[in-house]
């Protein structure tokens, strides 16, 4: 038997499809999401409706974004969910969540079992819409969740950690074994909750500058910041901000990255593109 087939659908490798089938895990995720009628619930990658059904049961209306044409068609003819669903057969990476929130008249509650092959770039896409999002609950590769929640001075701490924590409060919810999926992925999974900050703990004047600094620092994470960020900051400027030029990217806190971004935004602002 082909272990990539689930409920008559062949999992497509190019879409990174692994279908959740463990009822205990499904119940735990739905409980963590706690969907309520009247909320603007949006599911990314509903697949074979493992989460869509139990979430949809609690709602009058649910929006789903599904790239796979066959799966989107199955949802349209779903026996009891069909009338409740608004289906966008589209890539979530190009979806305008801000427009949807405006249309629905409230911030979105976004959830999904995300395809692991796009999870990190999709996170960055969603971060650009945090003003339009109330919260997010995602099943991700455990290693990605570890990176999202990591603090300074750890191997998992990187650009994703800094940017996620700049935008959101990040809370791990539960770990999920490969056996909970068809076909089983080769890695462990985990569920994470991301709640955009109501008030930014470390506001920056230009988030593009923060993105640039973190990219340059972590692209050369073994170098000291004296070297990796030498084109942006002199040793005198670093020490003036209370930063040791001998530190590496992974030693610098989110607050310190934001401090650096604000210095640069004031003293060497990026030109509008």
Curated annotation (Swiss-Prot):
Subcellular location: Cytoplasm
InterPro entries cross-referenced by the UniProt entry: KsgA/Erm, rRNA_Ade_diMease-like_C, rRNA_Ade_Mease_Trfase_CS, rRNA_Ade_methylase_Trfase_N, rRNA_adenine_dimethylase, SAM-dependent_MTases_sf
Positions bound to S-adenosyl-L-methionine: 18, 20, 45, 66, 91, 113
Record GO terms (molecular function): 16S rRNA (adenine(1518)-N(6)/adenine(1519)-N(6))-dimethyltransferase activity; RNA binding
Cellular component GO terms, alphabetical: cytosol
Short name of any one Pfam family annotated for the protein: RrnaAD
Full protein name: Ribosomal RNA small subunit methyltransferase A
Organism annotation: Shigella boydii serotype 18 (strain CDC 3083-94 / BS512)
Gene from which the chain derives: rsmA
């Amino acid at each position: 038997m082909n272990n990539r087939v689930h409920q008559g659908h062949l999992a497509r490798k190019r879409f990174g499809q692994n279908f959740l089938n463990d009822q205990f895990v499904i119940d735990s995720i739905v409980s963590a999401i706690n969907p309520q009628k009247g909320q603007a619930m949006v599911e990314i990658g509903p697949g074979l409706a493992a989460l869509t059904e139990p979430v949809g049961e609690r709602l009058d209306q649910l929006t789903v974004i599904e790239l796979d044409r066959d799966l989107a068609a199955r949802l349209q003819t779903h026996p009891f969910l069909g009338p409740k669903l608004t289906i966008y057969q589209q890539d979530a990476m190009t979806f305008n969540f801000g427009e949807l929130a405006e249309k629905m008249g409230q911030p979105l509650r976004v959830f999904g079992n995300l395809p692991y092959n796009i999870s990190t770039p999709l996170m960055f896409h969603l971060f650009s819409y945090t003003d339009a999002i109330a919260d997010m609950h995602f099943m991700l590769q455990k290693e990605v969740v570890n990176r999202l929640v990591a603090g300074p001075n750890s191997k998992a701490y990187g650009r994703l950690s800094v940017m996620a924590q700049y935008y959101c409060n990040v809370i791990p919810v539960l770990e999920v074994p490969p056996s909970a999926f068809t076909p089983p992925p080769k890695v462990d999974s985990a569920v994470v909750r991301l709640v955009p900050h109501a008030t930014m703990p470390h506001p920056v004047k230009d988030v593009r500058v923060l993105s640039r600094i973190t990219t340059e620092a972590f692209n050369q994470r073994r170098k000291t910041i004296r070297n990796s960020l030498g084109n942006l900051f002199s040793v005198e400027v670093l020490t003036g901000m209370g930063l040791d030029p001998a530190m590496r990217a992974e030693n610098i806190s989110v607050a310190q990255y934001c401090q650096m971004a604000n210095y640069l935004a004031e003293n060497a602002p990026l030109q509008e593109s």
